[in-house]
Amino acid sequence: MDRRDFLKTAGLGAAALGVAACTPKVVEGGAGSTQQNGLPEGGAMQQNYPGVGLLGYGCMRWPMTAGADGRKVIDQQEVNRLVDVAMEHGVNYYDTSPNYLGGESERATAEALNRYPRDRWLLATKLSNFSDWSYDNSVLMYRNSLEIFRTDHIDYYLLHSIGGMKAFETRFGSTGIMDFLLRERELGHIRKLGFSFHGNKEGFDELMSLHSKYHWDFVQIQMNYVDWRHAGRNNTDAEYLYGVLDRMEIPVVIMEPLRGGRLADMPVTLADMLLAKDPSGSLASWAFRFAGSFPRVLTVLSGMTYMEHLEDNLRTYLDFKPLDAGEMELLQDVATRMETYPLVRCTGCNYCMPCPYGIDIPGIFKFYNDNLNAGTYVKDSGKENYARIRRRYLLDYDKAIPTVRQADHCIQCGRCEEACPQHLSIRSELRKIDEYIESLKRETL
């Protein structure tokens, strides 16, 4: 059962927010939008830092709809509706990038936010100079962001997805762009300058050694209760990353608190452990309570595509209850057990897309993980109801992933792995899934 199905089954609609209580460190949600879906007017958003809501909006997963030509486009009307409800309840930090959603995320986010006074929202966007990192192109990208948002300043500006000193020097250090960004910060056009990190411990330590030179105002890291101590190959445990930033008194922005949705849609046996402790709470609420329980956290980003996601997260942060020691221990137990499942650690960020050969890489991984979670991944032909499960698996695979976009079309070019911030062995994972599909087709399990 995914997050949307759980929320509908549990009856956790917007009206439930009416009982949200105020906590000591809160900010009142501003007026300007009308009451929608039974949500209470105003609201009280938890804060660790004055003026910044603990729940931040990640703008990489805006809802999509069919355009005039049949292709998917951002559903601007729904984006506006989501932003209205978020703003009404104190969500004021919006994180986007020139790279997100085919370059359209900034435009859609700007259209929604510019209906509000500039002092009501905090803009976080990025220097996503992955393919052309020349000085001129980097400056142009920065100025385009200012122009799109019709603003004279960016509140939080990030060097996008750095894995270590080599990437930093190539894209920023050797081009002269850092001097430009530092001048922009001095002039007030950049209020806070930081970076988002994906990489190993050595790379992180190298970047933090630059703090005395550049003074990082904040750092964005991947942090959730699994990655806290189980970040996996070529990544760094969030416990270490957060610990370094905490000691240096640098505010932390959290990305992937749900690990790409995996912590809201986990194996049934693990979900039951959390539901036994809190039958009325969503699986996602556990992850967001974990992320919000650390005092150095500036904001926790969530890519809330649907209103149910936004409402669920608002329930968590409008009446915030930090995890106690027993709950922390329970989550670490769940995390340890989760590591025994052969899930692909894909977060669905789509950085690997488009594949030059048309393969739906995130879709294939999602299908595989969803079936593992649901217990419909058969490992041997002796399992009860094997024939029925096998047939259903193959039919559902063809329905979820068009034949021309399936794993057997991978030619092992490796371009996807170069772009993957999780450092996944994508080719190996696709080959493994393709071999499994073939074994089902040939009935050779």
Name each region found by the language model.
Residues T65-A66, D132-V253, L258, D265, ...:
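Glycine/proline-rich, positively charged
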Residues Y57, Y94, T109, L123, ...:
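Conserved, mostly hydrophobic/aromatic
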Residues Y93-Y100, R191-S196, T299-L301, C420:
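Short catalytic-loop micro-motif centered on adjacent basic/acidic residues
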Residues D2-W121, M165, F180, E186:
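N-terminal binding-site loop/beta-alpha segment at the start of enzyme catalytic domains
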Residues Y100, Y116-Y135, V139, H160-S161:
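Structural motif corresponding to the early beta-alpha repeats
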